[in-house]
């Protein structure tokens, strides 16, 4: 797949040109023959051509750039017969429609990487594993532990739905055109449903409210958002009233979200 098109800055396109790196990324997905693979933004096919070599059962490609949609449409019959190509912005894809078991992979554009991962971990019920290349700063946030500078809303949200594993750093010279920052690979392993947030809308609202004031004490934040009997709830969960959001684990935030629901408080419907 050596056909080239001019990268579109408006789409945040940086094409991976290092075949060795592409091979390492796909290998992390641990594809077995016959498994279903979902690739977001295949572009010139740096990852796709390695995926073909594993003889997947179904290969679903979502591509926003019409040039690359045409390209992959022209080559798909040469490889895997069960290839479906959607000409679509991945942010608008109906993730709930995926049936069966899927593995997801992508070199995500920097400008939409966080938003896509947010959606995927909480909406794809049939995902067994995902491998993403993102801006290193985003990877740091995805893997961050409580009490660290990078720990925040994205960390808590994603780690509540999946185990996140750091892969490796990819330097700018591996791309065309070269980005100004390093990229990094992360692998996500979805957690069992019983370990995930029970009400994702409430959970999202709670963590966003808390991290808007990450340096304030929890008792002040909960009082401000109208959390009734917050002191008793904090004591029941085992959170100090003087604790700050950045020090709490995703499990504690999930328990706090459940306590909030029990208060029968009206909470915003938008997340």
UniProtKB/Swiss-Prot annotation:
Using the record, list the residue span of the signal peptide; answer none if the entry has no such feature.
Answer: none
Q: What is its EC number?
A: 2.1.1.182
InterPro entries recorded for this chain?
KsgA/Erm (IPR001737), rRNA_Ade_diMease-like_C (IPR023165), rRNA_Ade_Mease_Trfase_CS (IPR020596), rRNA_Ade_methylase_Trfase_N (IPR020598), rRNA_adenine_dimethylase (IPR011530), SAM-dependent_MTases_sf (IPR029063)
Q: Which reaction does it catalyse?
A: adenosine(1518)/adenosine(1519) in 16S rRNA + 4 S-adenosyl-L-methionine = N(6)-dimethyladenosine(1518)/N(6)-dimethyladenosine(1519) in 16S rRNA + 4 S-adenosyl-L-homocysteine + 4 H(+)
Keyword line:
Cytoplasm, Methyltransferase, RNA-binding, rRNA processing, S-adenosyl-L-methionine, Transferase
- Identify the domain of life: Bacteria
Q: Which SMART domains match?
A: rADc
A Pfam family: RrnaAD
Q: What Gene Ontology cellular component terms go with this record? A: cytosol
Q: Where in the cell is it found?
A: Cytoplasm
Which GO terms of the molecular function aspect are on file? 16S rRNA (adenine(1518)-N(6)/adenine(1519)-N(6))-dimethyltransferase activity; RNA binding
Q: What is its main location?
A: cytoplasm
Sequence positions that bind S-adenosyl-L-methionine: 14, 16, 41, 63, 89, 107
Q: Does the keyword Methyltransferase apply?
A: yes
UniProt keyword Cytoplasm present: yes
NCBIfam families per record: ksgA
Q: Which family does it belong to?
A: Belongs to the class I-like SAM-binding methyltransferase superfamily. rRNA adenine N(6)-methyltransferase family. RsmA subfamily.
Say what the protein does: Specifically dimethylates two adjacent adenosines (A1518 and A1519) in the loop of a conserved hairpin near the 3'-end of 16S rRNA in the 30S particle. May play a critical role in biogenesis of 30S subunits.
Q: What is this protein called?
A: Ribosomal RNA small subunit methyltransferase A
State the organism named in the record. Lawsonia intracellularis (strain PHE/MN1-00)
